[in-house]
Amino acid sequence: MLRRFTGLILTTTALSLAASATAQTTLAELDAENEAVKSVVEVSSPIDYSDHDILMERVTVSKGGRPRVAYDFLRSQDVDFVGNQVSFLASQDISALNENDRLAYWLNLQNIVTVQAVLEDGKKKKSLKKLRGTADKPGKLWTKDRVTIGGQAMSLQDIETKLLTEFDNPNVIYGIYQGVRGGPCLMRKAYRGVTVNETLEQNAKQYVNSNGIVTVKNNVVELTPVFLWYQDAAFKGDDKVLLAHLKDNADPNLKSALYRGRSFASTSLNYSLDFHDVNKAAQERAAANRPAARPRPRTTPQPQPRPSGGGYGS
């Protein structure tokens, strides 16, 4: 079944114009770009994710290779489209899907529901530390019922638990979007069953090798808490399994350092809201492109005439 949010391009004109201002892109180019997104050959999938692709392309901006949602710039229509996509996924019958298609489905649902949850409860927060919480003590963002699947109300915690228990793949953790900058990044394209495992492998390598995620100091492997949150579910609670996983995904320099690792330590997680500030980016770009002020020409001071009859004794 093919579906289209036919008004998506028109109702997100404000976001498109912001993108054009910051990237010096004309509206015509944006329309052409949107048509290109729609014309991409759809990978075979029992669920049509083309609207998901278009939506995520329109509401996210790639910042340093990491897609971030422009929460502050989304209008009510954009929020509605996010909700419509959540409703569409919630209405799907997934009982006959194979394992990879089910995995892709739950990852896509988790990602878009997280975006919706942040829009509802967290977009005005600089930090999601309290709202997100931890694996042991999840906050409201994770525990509040967000979507109904098959007549059952589900929270992000419920969706996460399903992903971790139903699919025997440690790379699943790299598809669980946390809404924070210290977690795995949001995808600008939907997961598809035929490519989901390869995509998660790419996510794993990107995350493990990201700055500050995994470091080795004095034979201690310092990790972001995300790995320790999921150690039991993804790595059997075994430090050796986790270390082997990190080595498999590390680049040569990090991999060499990991061989010196003898123990693990948890670092702090960057709970900053994972969003792109369109206005700030525009201001920074404008400042960078502003021509330097010309120095004022130096003038030689002219001698002032002495007043007649002047002097201290007059």
Per-region residue spans from a language model:
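Bacterial N-terminal signal peptides
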Residues: 8-17
